[in-house]
C-alpha cells in the first residue's frame, strides 16, 4: 500500500509539473501573439533598407525648366501637371497630363507604365507641392520621378507673378539669429496604427493617407514661426556654414541628406509638437516633409523657405534666391 501511495503521488506530481509546463508555453505563445509589432520601427527599417532616398545624394530630385523644354518631344519624358483644372486650362506645358495629387498613385499604377520613362516630371505652381508629391512617389519606389524647379513660375512670367514674385520678402531678415542651438535629446517615437505587420504593407497604408491629404495642410508661414517659435521644433535644413550666418530664432541645424536616419539624428525629433523645416526655397524641404509625414511625425514646411523672410541675403550670397532671372518665356498650351 505504501509503495502504491508513493507511485500515485509521483504520478500526481508529474502531472502537475507537466500541466504547469504546458500552461507556461501557452502563456508565452499567448503573450507573443497579443504583442503587436511596433509599426514605426518596422516601417523605418523597411524604408532605410529599400527606399532611403531622403538620406542620399539623390535628394532633392529637382529638374530645371530648360531640360523639360528641351525634351517636350521626347517620348521618354512624361510630364504631369498637378495644378487645378482651371490653371491647367489657363496654360500648361505641351504634352502635360493634368492629374490631381490624390489620384497620382492610381495614375502610376493604372494609366502608365512608369518604368518605360527615363524621367517623370511633376509640375505645380511654385515647385513646392510638386516636390512634396514627388517625394511620396520616390518613397513609393518610383526612382525616375522629379519635380520641376520653381514650378510654372520658371516657365512664364505671369505664373511667377502669381506665385514666387509675390512671396519673396526680407521683412524678417533683421530678426534672424546666429545662436547655435543643440538638438533635442532622443525621445519617444511616433505612433503608427495601420493594423499591418509588414513594412511594405504599412508603407502602402501610410502613402494612401498621405496622397489623400492636401499639401496645404503641411504649409507653415515663416511669420507664424517667428512670432511663436516655442510652438514648434524648428529645423534649419542647411549646412553649418549657412546656419552660422543667420537662421530663424531657436532653429536647430540638421545636415541635408544624412541627418534624418536612425543612425544619425532622426530620434531627436519630438512627437509632442510640430516639426517645421526651413531651407532656401521650400522645395528641398518638401521632400523631407513627405518622408517624415509618412513616418508619422507631425511635420510642416515653411512656405518659400528663407526666400520668404531673408530674400536679399540669399540673393547677395547666391544661396538660392528666386529672381526674375529664373523666369523664362516658354510657350504654353491654352
What are these regions (language model features)?
Residues 58-77, 82-112, 117, 121, ...:
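Post-signal peptide N-terminal segment of secreted/secretory-pathway proteins
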Residues 57, 252-254, 309-330:
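Surface-exposed intrinsically disordered loops and tails
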Residues 237-238, 242-245, 249-255, 260-261:
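Eukaryotic modular interaction domains in large regulatory/scaffold proteins
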Residues 108-155, 254, 262-312:
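Catalytic cysteine-centered active loop of the rhodanese-like fold, especially the PTP/DSP P-loop
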Residues 147-176, 303-322:
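Cysteine-dependent PTP/DSP-like catalytic domain, specifically the C-terminal lobe
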Residues 13, 22-78, 85-90, 160-242, ...:
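Flexible, polar/low-complexity N-terminal or interdomain linker segments that lie immediately upstream
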Residues 1-4:
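Positively charged n-region of N-terminal signal peptides that target proteins for export
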Residues 9-17:
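Bacterial N-terminal signal peptides
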